[in-house]
């Protein structure tokens, strides 16, 4: 079943290759969507794909890349049209 989740990741998540690493992991898992920095220092990600793959990526977001220090990941289910790829915005 295809699911779509919007995530807000807080902590030391900008300037640590978080977006590029998220894209790499998403592509590895077959998840589509996007990831971007927010002005308040958080990272926002939209994840769409098979529920199992999206859950795996959500779990990975709690760790992130080596230099990241994630303190919180908030997520909510959203409904949007199908996305074809994963991009860094």
UniProtKB/Swiss-Prot annotation:
Protein name as it appears in the record: Acylphosphatase
Active site (record annotation): 19, 37
PROSITE patterns per the UniProt record, alphabetical: ACYLPHOSPHATASE_1 (PS00150), ACYLPHOSPHATASE_2 (PS00151), ACYLPHOSPHATASE_3 (PS51160)
Residue ranges occupied by any Acylphosphatase-like domain in the UniProt entry: 4-89
GO molecular function, one term: acylphosphatase activity
The UniProt record lists the keyword ATP-binding: no
UniProt-listed Enzyme Commission number(s): 3.6.1.7
Enzyme class per UniProt: hydrolase
Keywords: Hydrolase
Reaction catalysed by this enzyme: an acyl phosphate + H2O = a carboxylate + phosphate + H(+)
Pfam families in the record: Acylphosphatase (PF00708)
Family: Belongs to the acylphosphatase family.
